[in-house]
């Protein structure tokens, strides 16, 4: 099964093709892109075209479209979901929704993973993963309420995503580990 996937839930636009032979081709923006204004309407379709060309596939070879469904910014999600529906409808393909928090968590190699997306207004979208399995459903909360909302001691957890970059000091003061700013772990892939 060959899939085209993309995510526009944060400021960074990411896209990929997963070919039926298991080989993946990604358009992963630089992590610094998370601190810039979003450009999804300009970046998404060229990114999809780029990964499809590098993968050597056309729409006739694709079996489905996967799209990040957040949580995230309203406009970003609207661009991503509308693009997925439009492309899939034109090619008569199914659309597969993917949690953006789960996609972030997939890159975490730690017992406790805390994917965080900046929800603005001093809050984060979060979920908690233990050894890759989601153990706390997605929620929104200010960073100082994460332990209370998850019902867990978060010291030693690894936090990724643009929310972890924005609230690094608060998280690290609570014993949460945050990869360096330039890490690709912070980009939804």
Which residue stretches match the model-derived regions?
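Phosphate-handling active-site elements
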Residues: 55-60, 88-98
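N-terminal beta-alpha supersecondary unit
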Residues: 1-69
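Short, conserved micro-motifs enriched in small and acidic residues
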Residues: 38-42, 74-78, 188-189
């Amino acid at each position: 099964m060959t899939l085209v996937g993309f995510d526009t839930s944060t400021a960074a636009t990411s896209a990929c093709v997963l070919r039926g032979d298991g080989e993946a081709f990604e358009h992963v923006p630089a992590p610094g892109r998370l601190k810039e204004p979003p450009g999804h309407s300009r970046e998404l379709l060229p990114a999809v075209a780029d990964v499809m060309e590098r993968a050597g596939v056309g729409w006739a070879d694709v079996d489905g479209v996967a799209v990040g469904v957040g949580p995230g910014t309203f406009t970003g999600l609207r661009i991503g979901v509308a693009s997925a529906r439009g492309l899939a409808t034109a090619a008569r393909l199914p659309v597969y929704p993917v949690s953006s928090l789960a996609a972030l968590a997939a890159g975490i190699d730690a017992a406790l993973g805390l994917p965080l997306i900046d929800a603005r207004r001093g809050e984060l979208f979060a979920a908690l993963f233990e050894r890759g399995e989601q153990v706390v459903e997605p929620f929104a909360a200010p960073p100082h309420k994460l332990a209370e909302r998850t019902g867990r001691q978060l010291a030693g957890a690894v936090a990724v995503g643009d929310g972890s970059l924005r609230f690094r000091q608060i998280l690290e003061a609570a014993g949460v580990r945050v990869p360096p700013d330039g890490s690709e772990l912070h980009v939804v892939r």
